[in-house]
């Protein structure tokens, strides 16, 4: 499969990959390694503002690249972060995700929503 230049750049560099630790860190995940796609986000939140984001992902290059992009572009008030920094359709176009892989973007979105929900519940 041929990947877009943007997908390859984020896949190879994987900026913000890893975990965050501390009392002000919130974690959410979605998907299943057994099914081929799993994503986890960690958010460090201070005063209701996202200070840092990290991700772990298991899946195809599109999954890893989009997760990296989302973590890199996370920021702002956590109350406004219940949706991805960009919509699933926009991310699909930005990263040239083929139709048969777009379900993976929904897993990324579910992981993001789970993480923000965890932050809002504390």
Describe the function of each predicted region.
Residues 1-122:
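Domain-level signature for proteins that mediate thiol-based redox and metal-cofactor handling
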């Amino acid at each position: 499969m041929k990947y877009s230049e943007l997908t390859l750049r984020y896949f190879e560099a994987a900026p913000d990959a890893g975990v965050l630790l501390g009392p002000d860190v919130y974690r959410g995940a979605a998907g299943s390694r057994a099914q081929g796609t799993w994503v986890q986000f960690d958010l460090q939140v201070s005063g209701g503002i996202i200070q840092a984001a990290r991700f772990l992902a298991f899946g195809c290059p599109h999954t890893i690249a989009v997760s990296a992009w989302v973590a890199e572009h996370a920021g702002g008030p956590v109350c406004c972060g219940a949706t991805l920094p960009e919509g699933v359709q926009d991310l699909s176009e930005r990263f040239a995700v083929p139709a048969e892989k777009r379900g993976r973007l929904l897993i990324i979105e579910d992981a993001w929503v789970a993480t923000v929900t965890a932050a809002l519940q504390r």
